[in-house]
Each structure stands twice: as structure tokens, then as C-alpha cells.
Swiss-Prot record:
GO terms for cellular component: cytoplasm; fibrillar center; mitotic spindle pole; nuclear envelope; nuclear pore; nucleoplasm. Its main location: cytoplasm. Belongs to the WD repeat rae1 family. It is found in: Cytoplasm; Nucleus; Cytoplasm, Cytoskeleton, Spindle pole. This is mRNA export factor. The modification Phosphothreonine is found at T229. Interacts with NUMA1 (via N-terminal end of the coiled-coil domain); this interaction promotes spindle formation in mitosis. Interacts with NUP98. Interacts with MYCBP2. Interacts with USP11. Residues 15-34 are annotated as: Disordered. Keywords: Cell cycle, Cell division, Cytoplasm, Cytoskeleton, Mitosis, Nucleus, Phosphoprotein, Repeat, Transport, WD repeat.
Amino acid sequence: MSLFGSTSGFGTGGTSMFGSTTTDNHNPMKDIEVTSSPDDSIGCLSFSPPTLPGNFLIAGSWANDVRCWEVQDSGQTIPKAQQMHTGPVLDVCWSDDGSKVFTASCDKTAKMWDLNSNQAIQIAQHDAPVKTIHWIKAPNYSCVMTGSWDKTLKFWDTRSSNPMMVLQLPERCYCADVIYPMAVVATAERGLIVYQLENQPSEFRRIESPLKHQHRCVAIFKDKQNKPTGFALGSIEGRVAIHYINPPNPAKDNFTFKCHRSNGTNTSAPQDIYAVNGIAFHPVHGTLATVGSDGRFSFWDKDARTKLKTSEQLDQPIAACCFNHNGNIFAYASSYDWSKGHEFYNPQKKNYIFLRNAAEELKPRNKK
């Protein structure tokens, strides 16, 4: 029996194979196009964990829906299932065993989607839109962490309608990440808080933001022992900060770099600066991808402090990205991110999710 029971696809499921895509300015990198992409802006992407055989991709959109595809080794994508919220879906994540997907929405709720039964139930409630959602698997507890614009961080046992714990945030939650035993939350007004999750979640440290502009995305990275050791933080000002929690030499080890900017130098020619919409670390190499409102993705080696690759420019922003569990596939979503306001929104423009073979391009150059 398949994970999703009988065929429960959505839309018209055409196929899209490696190497068979047509190229134009919506897909200048000749990457694989995911079939039946959402009908409105795509806000979040997440691949299934390694506990699940195969690769499944989840996307949440401003059409209030969450979609799931199976990604086959050939590159073919098969629509599997779909669930709805009553507001835009801002974040998605998986349970560690791959049996559940958790979704956060502007409708002020979070849901748990059981992929075997294809049933979704509400598991969380906030007083404002829920911006982030993460599954926490600790030795002594499991829970879902939700961050909201109501300035709270809540932790939920999925069997109870009341939160296990509520932590107050200094401002609205804008982005967050979790790799046990660490969580990091970035808020409005450039707030930045690290939490430790052992035994029970608690605030570990508040950090003065290394960035001067609004926080947009954050991703935790690991050290060589596979332990979370720091995070990358992106802002609307085309800049990423690499920040270690306990570095031997903070002034030397922590740094920021510019990205997602046009080629002007700011002195002789004005430079266009774009938001960093997403950051994802490669699960094997520890290198990272950034995507931006400029319609490009870039790959970086933070240890060598070098850029590995920048894509050609797509004809609309790249709103989200993620790697699959072994780092062979890089997924990125091309859709309007509202960075230029409603007057630049074109409802006729299609939204796309692309898949790229990432096995070689993310390797650090100094590795033999």
C-alpha cells in the first residue's frame, strides 16, 4: 500500500523529466518543473525526512493550500494530495518519522496532516497569523513549536488543545529554525533569540542583531560533529550574517556578506538591493543556498567565505528553497514575493517550483 492510499492527486498531473524542460526566462537554468504548482504565491517548501523511503515535497501557498508531490528518481513529479486552510499558508514542516506534515497559516491556526489517512486536524491556535512551525523531537518529549505575529512562541502536544508552554517574544515572529537541541527565532524590530530545548524549551540568549535591516529568514548550521553550532540570518537588505553561538573568536568568526544585489557599485553606479527570501544548508557539505527577490539563487561556502555559483535571473522572485534529505535535490519556488507591493503583482503570471541536481555544485571547492 502506498503512503497516500489510493490515487489522490490534484490538478492535471503531467510529467516532467530531467533534461526535457523547455527554457525561457521563467526557467533559465533548465531545471525540472514540478507539475501542478500552486495557483498563488508559494511561501514555503519542505522535503520529507530520511526516515521515509523516496522523496516527497510539500509546498504551502497564498491560495490557502498545502500540496504534496512524490519526486521520483527520474525527476518526474507526481501530485499526491492536498489540504486547505482558510488563509495563506506561511510555513510547513514534517514529523521526524515522515507520517505527518504540520502547517501554519494566516488563519491563526496550525494543522497536523496525517498523510496515511489524508486527514488534517487543527492542533494550534494563536491570536494572529502563525508565521513559523517546527517539529521538535527530544529524548523526553515531542512537540510542535509555533511562532506568531501575536508575539508568542507556543509549544504543542498534538493530543491536547492547550499549549504545553507559551514563551513571550519581544516582537512579532518573522522567522525561526530548529535543530535539536537548539532553536533560533528572529522577530520584528531586529529581535534575535536562541533557545535551548533539552528537558524543556527555555531562553538561552538574546543576541544583538548583526544586521541593520528587517529579518527575513534564518537557518541553523552544524559543526563537523553534526551538532548545531550557529545560524545564518538573512535580511531585506541583500545581506546574510553568519553567527556562531560560542565562537573561539567572535570578532573573527562571525561575519556578514552581501548578496542578491545588482552589479552597481554604489559609488559609480547605484546598486539595486533585494531581500534574501530563504536560506538552506546542504545536509552533507554544510554549504548553503540563498534565494532572493532578484530572481536568483546562489550557493556559498561559509567556511572558505566564497561564492560557489549564482544562477541566471528568473523573471520573478524566488520566494523559498530547500534541499532533500541527502542533498541531491535543490528545490526553489518562483513566484511573486510582494517585495514591490501590490502594483507589481501580476495575477496572470504562473507560479513554479523547480528541482535542480545539487550533488556537485554544493561541494566545497577545496575538498579533493
